[in-house]
Amino acid sequence: MDELMGKCELLYEGKVREVYDCDDKLVMVATDRISAFDHILKNKVTEKGAILTQMSKFWFDYTKDVVANHMVSVDVNDMPEFFHKDEYIGRSMLCKKLTMLPVECIVRGYITGSGWASYKENGTVCGIKLPEGLKESEKLPEPIYTPSTKAEIGDHDENISFEKSIEVLEKQFPGKGLEYATKIKDATITLYKKCAEYALSKGIIIADTKFEFGLDENGEVVIGDEMLTPDSSRFWPLEGYEAGKSQPSYDKQFVRDWLKANPDSDYLLPDDVIEKTVEKYKEAYKLLTGKDFSRK
């Protein structure tokens, strides 16, 4: 899909998304590819891309009065004719062009995953000292902000301190490092608190998530990429939640766990794992939006 399409051309192909440059806008297409441990898996997960796109749309709509976002439309009829094909319906998003900021904004409301491993070792998560005596999967007294660098495909993101995020941003935007670092930190915490409270009311714990921000044509900080999807977040069922153990999830943690248990898989998943992953994504979508998932 790298041919010219009217006034559109393939700009970027990531682990999961393809981004097309269409004059003054972008079209982001979420494929059914799935990645874990910074590798693209050999299987595709049916309808996954459309679920991610529709879930991002839900959250962009829900938070648009709090922080502006890049979404223009998810209706392919608003996009160039090339995208008026069945394969693009439901999984494509017309977006404003942003100058993306080179920091991934991670917020953690519960201690789990790599954060739990770090805490057990030295009582910190990404250099942030936490209270003693926390249990695995326990809710933190306050959400913590743990930014990281953006790695190229095949490389690993690197956790950085807030101070380091200022340096990274200052290098690209002289005189603006502190301002942008503060704005994206504050926006990340605000968005997380609002959305985590909503999700909890629907039976889902958002343990942690990742946001990406950019600057619009007016230099305003705007949220881009995806928002609060099972790819960018840890979603746990509220029912049965108990600190002190790992939690079942509605996200790709299920895939990560299978890969860890099967190190010789060569990143090829069996059909039942694929089916279970689709079920989990659809269940999360229904709980959060109140609607059965439909691509069209």
From Swiss-Prot:
* Entry's EC annotation: 6.3.2.6
- Which PROSITE patterns does this chain map to? SAICAR_SYNTHETASE_1, SAICAR_SYNTHETASE_2
Catalyses which reaction(s): 5-amino-1-(5-phospho-D-ribosyl)imidazole-4-carboxylate + L-aspartate + ATP = (2S)-2-[5-amino-1-(5-phospho-beta-D-ribosyl)imidazole-4-carboxamido]succinate + ADP + phosphate + 2 H(+)
UniProt GO BP = 'de novo' IMP biosynthetic process
Name the Pfam families on file. Answer: SAICAR_synt
What keywords were assigned to this record? ATP-binding, Ligase, Nucleotide-binding, Purine biosynthesis
Keyword ATP-binding belongs to the record: yes
- Indicate the enzyme's highest-level EC class: ligase
GO terms for molecular function, please? ATP binding; phosphoribosylaminoimidazolesuccinocarboxamide synthase activity
Q: Which domain of life is it from?
A: Bacteria
User: Which HAMAP family did the record assign?
Assistant: SAICAR_synth
Family affiliation:
Belongs to the SAICAR synthetase family.
Q: What is this protein called?
A: Phosphoribosylaminoimidazole-succinocarboxamide synthase
Q: Which gene encodes it?
A: purC
